[in-house]
Amino acid sequence: MGQSHSKGNSGPGDSLQSYPSFSRSDTKESLRSLRGSIRSKIRSSDSPRGSTAGLSDDKSDAASVKSTTSRRSSTNQSVQSPDDTPSQPDAPEPPPSPSLSSSLKRGHKDVNAMQQSGEVDHVSDVPPTGAAPTGPSTQKVGESILIKRENQLNPILDFIMNAPLETSGSPGMGMGALKSIDLDDMISRLLDAGYSTKVTKTVCLKNAEIMAICSAARELFLSQPALLELSAPVKIVGDVHGQYTDLIRLFEMCGFPPASNYLFLGDYVDRGKQSLETILLLLCYKLKYPENFFLLRGNHECANVTRVYGFYDECKRRCNIKIWKTFIDTFNCLPIAATVAGKIFCVHGGLSPSLSHMDDIRGIARPTDVPDYGLLNDLLWSDPADMEEDWEPNERGVSYCFGKKVIMNFLQRHDFDLVCRAHMVVEDGYEFYQDRILVTVFSAPNYCGEFDNWGAIMSVSGELLCSFELLKPLDSTALKNHIKKGRKERNSMLSSPVSPPLLRFVVAKEDHNLFVQHRRDACGLFLAYPSLVTSWGISR
C-alpha cells in the first residue's frame, strides 16, 4: 500500500475545499480503535454527540444507542463517545481512508500490452460488440435480483421499529405519501442539477423531501437483510465520495437504472463537493427500484467520520444539522455485505477474524453505529496486504490487515471464488490481489482532484463472466465539457418529436430515467477469457 501521489494534471482549483494531501500521520493514533483515530480531530463542542444532543428529545436516534457489552465484543451496537474529546485543529486533516495502493507508484497499466498478453479482450470508446463473449442476458429489465428466503435472520432493534419515522412535521411528505411520481420528479431535478455543472448553495430538493427520502429508505433498508443475496447480472461500484458528475458519467456509461442492476460498496459521501446530491440520487434510485439497486455501508457512512471529513459541514452549510442527523439515522440501517450468485463476496473493507459464518453478518442488529472493535468495524475498515502473517494491525489505525492465507481459507470455507471490495484508491480503478482471489474496485476517477486514477465498475454477467468498465480521469474543465455534451444529448432526446408508438417508449424511458448511454471519454475494458473464469470457478 504505497503512499505516493499520482501524476495528477489538475490544478489547485480541482481539489476539494482545503483538505491537505494524504499522509501516514493520519493513522498512527492507536492500533485498532476507530474513534481513537477520529476523536483527536473533532472539537469537543462539535462532536457528533454534542451536535445532535439539542436537536430532538427523540431517543430513537440509533447513533446514540449504548453498547450492552464490552468494547472488545463483536457486537455492533455503538459505544458512546466520552465527553472529554480532544480539540480539533482549524483545518481538518484528511481521512484515514481510503488507503493508497502501491499501484499509484507504478503508474497506469499499458493497455496495449494488456491486450497483447490476453488480459484485456476489448478496449474501446463504445460498448463491446460482435463476438465479445459477454453472453446474452435472460433477465428482463426491472426483474428482481434479490434472493429472498423464508425466516431469514434479520434482527431489528424493537424500539426503532416501534418509533415513528420523523418527517419534519410535514404531513404531506410522510413515507406513505412518497409515491412513484414524487420520486420521478426528484430524480429529474437531481439529474438536472448534475447536468447544470454548478454547485449551488442550496440543494434542489426541499428539506421535507430529503427527510421523506431518508425515512422511506431507512424502512426499506431494514426490510432487507444485512447480508444481501443477489443473482447476476449486476454491476459493482466502489467508492464515489461525493463526486456527483462522475456518478452521472458512470450511469451514462453503464446504464441508468433499471437498464442495469447495481450494487454499490459504500463511501458515498465526504471529500467530494456534492455529497448531498450523490447520496440523494442513490437513495431515490433505491426507493424506485428496491430489488435491482443496492447500497452497502462504507466506513464513511458513520457519524464520527462524516463529522470530520466534509459531509457534516456540507449538510450544515446547505441544509441544516438536523438533515445530517437524519442521514446518519439512515446510514445506521444500511446493509453490510452481499453475495452475488453465491460465488462473489462483496463488502466495503475486507474480512474479519470475528467472521466464522455468514450468519454472523446476518445477525448484526440494525440500526447501529460503527463500534470501536469487532465484526462490523472490520468489515468496513480492514485491508488486504502482502505479508506472511494472517492478521496484523492496520496502519490506518483502525482494524486489521489480512494476508493471502486468510483469504484462501475464507473462500474455501464459504465456497466463494472471489472477494470484491473497495476502500482503497487504485491507479487503474481496479486491482487484483494475488492469483485473482480478491479485487479492489474504486469508482471515483481523479479522486479529489489530486490523483490521476481511473474509476472502475465491475460487471458480472448472467454467466458470471467478470468485466471492467473504466471512467477516464478528467480535470474540472474536461469534466464540465463532458457533462455539457451529455446535457445536450439528454435535452435533445427529451424534446425530439416522435411518432406515437415511439413516444410511448420514450415516456417509459423517461419514467425510468434511461437516457442515451454514450461512452464518450470513457473506456470499456472487458476481461473474459476461459482461463480466468475457470480459475475463479465462477460458473453455473
Swiss-Prot record:
UniProt domain Phosphatase tensin-type: residue ranges: 258-540
Record carries keyword Metal-binding: yes
Function: Catalytic subunit of protein phosphatase Z (PPZ) involved in iron assimilation. Regulates secondary metabolites production, including gliotoxin, pyripyropene A, fumagillin, fumiquinazoline A, triacetyl-fusarinine C, and helvolic acid. Plays a key role in pathogenicity.
Family statement drawn from the similarity comment of this UniProt entry: Belongs to the PPP phosphatase family. PP-Z subfamily.
Keyword list, A-Z: Cytoplasm, Hydrolase, Manganese, Metal-binding, Protein phosphatase
Gene: ppzA
Descriptive protein name: Serine/threonine-protein phosphatase ppzA
Residues annotated to bind Mn(2+) 1: 239, 241, 267
Region (Disordered): 1-108, 120-140
Catalytic activity line of the entry: O-phospho-L-seryl-[protein] + H2O = L-seryl-[protein] + phosphate; O-phospho-L-threonyl-[protein] + H2O = L-threonyl-[protein] + phosphate
